[in-house]
């Protein structure tokens, strides 16, 4: 009797196996596919191919077994992506165009709180970018920690850093990824702590330092990133 029940079970499993991981006459992947890590029984992905092209939803797995990412292939050029932390919460979500990141991408902490909003064009950061102070519970308000402009993947334009009270902590300008011009740094109460110029990411010129309590200030002159000391003072 046991042998009688084994026959249909084998038949079912065999039929199922024939419905996945098939190739068309051109040798291209066709239909449902399940991929595995090399030299392993651990699943790497599940999805559907149409004449070698991924179509619809693909689920990708980490070697440890949890879901790494979910990709929805909208057409030949556009796909929506969700990436996951190992605890199952979303780590990042956004869109690809021609296999390059495009538009807004949202980055989240393991606790499911927003950390960044990045904007891409043809795979490079472009436009206004945001980084947020980490949140640890639902009662905290989401507050910007850093805001800056990008061009071609590099910081280019106004850059600002904020404290948790929402006040500007520091600000200045970047040109092609390097600090350029006067940068100003503030105490928590909003008064100036120090300010001075950069040239191609290096301190150059007179820097002023304030104690935050009086109008007194100290001045240091920098040359190529080094404090300038007159010969008479050496």
Regions found by a protein language model. Give the residues of each.
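Glycine/tyrosine- and acidic-biased, solvent-exposed loop/turn segments at the edges of beta-strands
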Residues: 15-234
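Bacterial Sec-dependent N-terminal signal peptides
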Residues: 1-21
């Amino acid at each position: 009797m046991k042998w009688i029940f084994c026959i249909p079970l084998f038949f079912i499993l065999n039929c199922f196996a024939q419905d996945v991981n098939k190739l068309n006459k051109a040798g291209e992947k066709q239909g449902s596919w399940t991929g595995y890590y090399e030299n392993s029984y651990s699943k790497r992905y599940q999805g559907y191919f149409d004449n070698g092209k991924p179509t619809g939803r693909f689920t990708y797995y980490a070697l440890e077994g949890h879901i790494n990412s979910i990709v929805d292939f909208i057409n030949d050029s556009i796909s929506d992506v969700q990436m996951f932390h190992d605890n199952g919460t979303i780590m990042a979500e956004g869109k690809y165009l021609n296999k390059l990141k495009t538009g807004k991408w949202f980055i989240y902490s393991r606790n499911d709180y927003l950390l960044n909003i990045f904007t891409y064009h043809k795979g490079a950061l472009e436009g206004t970018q945001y980084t947020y102070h980490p949140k640890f519970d639902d009662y905290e308000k989401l507050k910007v920690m850093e805001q800056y402009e990008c061009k071609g993947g590099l910081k280019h334009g106004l850059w600002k850093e904020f404290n948790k009270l929402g006040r500007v902590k520091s600000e200045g300008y970047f040109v092609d990824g390097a600090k350029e011009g006067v940068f100003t740094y503030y105490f928590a109460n909003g008064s100036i702590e120090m300010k001075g110029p950069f040239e191609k990411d290096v301190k150059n010129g007179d820097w002023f330092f304030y104690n935050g309590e009086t109008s007194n200030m100290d001045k240091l002159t920098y040359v190529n990133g080094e404090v300038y000391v007159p010969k008479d003072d050496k």
